[in-house]
Amino acid sequence: MPLSKFGKRHKKTFGKKKEKWDGNFRIPPKPNSYYVQEKGICRWCGKKIIENKVHNKRKTWHQDCATDYMIIYHSGEARKHIWKRDKGKCNECGERCTRRGWDLDHVKPLMEQKGIKGNKLDWSYYELHNMQTLCRPCHKKKTKQDMKNNA
């Protein structure tokens, strides 16, 4: 199927990609480059990859760094980890949630990070210890409270 210059699909595929970080505080900035000058250097932290006391020149990610990256930039991965950790129970009311009837909540709300860029960004907001399982009603209540507190 050809892509029409004026179609939605064409715009989705080739349209101008805007920086998500400017107005959207939910996604932190990505590293400048995913490519490394030398194999065996982690793309995320920039340190050498050492396995069994030997510099592994075939890999480009530390396992922990790859997991952190996936949790931060792919919400499905974070949801999977939190669901397993909390065993599907709401941290507020203790009720068992259905697979689709729950929300991943940030204990320290991400709205506190709005507008913060560069080195001042607090990465702990995007780590697993700051995430919890909440059923939809509890998540609604907590979000409302967070909005009041940060207004």
Predicted regions and their residues:
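Generic domain-boundary/flexible-linker signal
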Residues: 53, 101-104, 146-149
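Histidine-centered nuclease catalytic patch
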Residues: 95-133
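Alpha-helical and His/Cys-centered functional microenvironments
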Residues: 14, 110, 143
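Short Cys/His-centered divalent metal-binding micro-motifs
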Residues: 66, 70, 95-98, 128-151
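Short, charged surface segments at domain edges that flank catalytic/cofactor-binding sites
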Residues: 26-34, 56-92, 120-125, 129
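BZIP DNA-binding basic region
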Residues: 2-26, 33-70
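A short, flexible N-terminal coil/short beta segment enriched in small residues
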Residues: 37, 83, 147
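Short cysteine-rich loop/turn motifs with clustered Cys
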Residues: 40-49, 75-108, 135-137
